[in-house]
Structures are given as C-alpha cells and as structure tokens.
A protein has these predicted regions:
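N-terminal low-complexity segments that are often proline-rich with Ser/Thr-Pro
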Residues: 1-30
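A broad, structural surface signal
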Residues: 19, 25, 35-43, 67, ...
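Amphipathic alpha-helical transducer elements in NTP-driven molecular machines
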Residues: 31-35, 59, 77, 105-109, ...
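Conserved beta-strand -> loop -> alpha-helix junction used to position metal-binding or nucleic-acid-contacting
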Residues: 33, 125-132, 137-173
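RNase H-like nuclease fold core
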Residues: 38-128, 132, 136-144, 235
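A generic short alpha-helical patch detector that favors 3-5-residue windows
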Residues: 75, 100-104, 126, 150, ...
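Acidic/histidine-rich catalytic cores and adjacent linkers
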Residues: 176-323
Length: 323
C-alpha cells in the first residue's frame, strides 16, 4: 500500500526498480527528488521500527545480510541485522532491521536490549548463527533463553572447504548427526563421520561440529515438530534471499538509513505481490494454485499447535501465563 501510494513500482521479484534506480539516480540529476520520495515513508519506517512488541516470543531468529553502503568517499560492506519473531499464535513478524559495520556479538547485544526496551521480556529459544560471543550477548538481555545455532549455517560452515564434487555426499553423511534421536546418538554419529573416509579427508568439517557442539545440541532434547521450528533459520533465510537480490541489484546504498528504508519497502512489496497473486487464485483447486505463501510477515509456522504444546511441556512456568 505504501509503495502504491508513492507510485514507485518496486519490481523486486526481478531484483529491479521498474520506475527508478535510487542509487543511479544521481547520474540523471534525480537523486534529490528520489530522496524526498523515500523520506515520505521514513516516518512510517521509524514507527514500524519502534512499535511496541509482545512480552513473550517463543522463538526469535537473528541473522544478517551484507550490503554495500557509501561511507564518505568509500563504499564499505556493512551488516543489515534482521530479527524475526514467532508470537504465541505461531505468526512470524519482522521485528526490525539494524545496520552496522560488521555482524558482531556486541552489536547483537544492543539489538536484544532494544527489543527488550520495546517490550520483549522473555524469549524461550533464540536461533542464530555460530558467531563467537552470541550466547553471552543474548544472555545479557534474556538470561533464561536457549541459544540454538542454526544447523543450516553449521552445515554450510562444515562444507566450506569441501570440494564441489564431494559436497552433496558430505552433506548427506552429516545428516545422522543432526537427525539423531538425542545428544548421545548425535555424538556417536559424529565419531562415525570422523572415522569415515570423508571425515579423514575433511577434518575441518569435523572441527566445525566439535567447536559448535554446545550451541548445536539444545534442539536434540525436543520432539520432531519443535526441532523443525528451531533448528534452522529457514524462516529468515528465505527473506534474506529476496533481500540480497534487492541489495545486489542496487550496487550500493547511499547511507545506512537508505538500507533500512529500501529493505522495509522490499518486504512490503514482496508481501503485497504475493497477496495479490493468492487473491487471483482464490477458489481454484489446490493443484492449480501456484502463488507463493507469505514470505515471512504474517506467515504461520507449520504444525505450530503441536510445537506450542511441546514448548509448554519444556518451559511450563514461562509459557503457561501467556496461554
């Protein structure tokens, strides 16, 4: 709606601004005018970024994408930090976007503190990457939160130095570790992988898991439905994929504020387009519907009722007052 009101057609599914390219606009002398256009949404962006939040989020996903931002006379890589929360109804919400020079635990601690200031008193499980210092940064705000390393990130790190021809086979060989019934079985699977041909060929893959073991294993204590919710940041990875397409097509952003504004507009535009596509297919048989579901905002976690039941068993004193 905001995008439509501004008459700026963000054709983000193809990674393009159909009406304008905000970053190349200076070449044509349009930079000032386009800055005024995006300034019209700044007030709404700030209201969104500062809005009150729920007291409890059962799960929060934390991640970041790298964007290029003009800084003085240079273009630097900066991290756009993104938080996605799952509320008690299983509905996903983008809680905010923050820009910083690098993705670091110290800055994430500030993000968590800001979320607390906006009303988040407790989080049961925080899913994040394996950044050193992340657990301490989260514990400073939510000391009882379970910190779970994203398994997708972990596998990606474990296969970073694996040859392309072996990558699929190594990924398959790692599955028994993160699909194990419990931590003991996972450790046995890791030992088996370590002794295997792939384990001997790629000791860095073994080290990735051993170094992250304490942050990797929390989800192994939960039943399958809850594991699927917490062991990966897929909810935010799909969002990041779309936002990376936008940022790459831009080349670089003029400043940090432009990053937040454009990424917010991107989220609005993607969700609006998907909603319109679903509306067109309403009434058709499921086999004929091709429109995608919600990207993140307003989407409901699959099998949430069952996952919530398991959360209530695992964290009764913290979750029951909110049921």
């Amino acid at each position: 709606e905001v995008v439509g009101a501004l008459d700026v057609d963000l054709d983000l599914d193809h990674g393009e601004l159909a009406a304008f390219d905000l970053l190349d606009a200076d070449v044509f002398g349009l930079g000032r005018a386009l800055e005024q256009v995006t300034d019209q949404v700044l007030e709404e962006v700030l209201a969104w970024q500062r809005r009150p939040l729920e007291a409890l989020y059962p799960v929060i996903y934390l991640d970041a994408i790298i964007v290029k931002v003009r800084d003085g006379g240079h273009v630097r890589n900066k991290a756009a930090h993104i938080a996605v929360g799952v509320d008690m109804d299983g509905i996903k919400h983008v809680l905010g976007i923050w820009v910083q020079q690098t993705e670091g635990a110290k800055f994430w601690a500030a993000v968590c503190a800001e979320l607390a200031n906006r009303g988040v008193r407790d989080v049961l499980i925080v899913c994040c990457d394996g950044l050193t210092g992340f657990p301490d940064a989260i514990a400073a705000t939510w000391p009882e939160a379970t910190v779970q390393t994203c398994v997708v990130h972990l596998i990606r790190a474990a296969t970073r130095f694996v040859s392309y021809t072996d990558r699929k086979s190594v990924s398959a060989a790692l599955k028994p570790i993160y699909q194990a019934a419990n931590e003991e079985a996972a450790l046995e699977a890791l030992e088996a992988f370590t002794a295997s041909e792939f384990g001997r060929r790629y000791p860095s893959a073994v080290k990735t898991f051993t170094d992250a073991w304490d942050r990797f294993t929390p989800f192994l204590a939960f039943p399958p439905e809850l594991r699927r919710v917490i062991y990966t940041t897929n909810s935010i990875e799909s969002l990041n994929y779309q936002l990376r397409k936008v940022s790459k097509s831009r080349g670089h952003f003029p400043n940090d504020q432009a990053v937040v504004k454009l990424l917010w507009l991107a989220i609005c535009d993607i969700e609006d387009k998907r909603a319109r596509a679903r509306a067109k297919e309403r009434g058709l048989p499921a086999t004929q519907r091709k429109a995608g579901g919600r990207l993140v905002e307003g989407g409901i976690v699959t099998n949430w009722k069952r996952a919530l039941e398991q959360l209530a068993l695992a964290y009764p004193d913290r979750i029951n007052p909110h049921l």
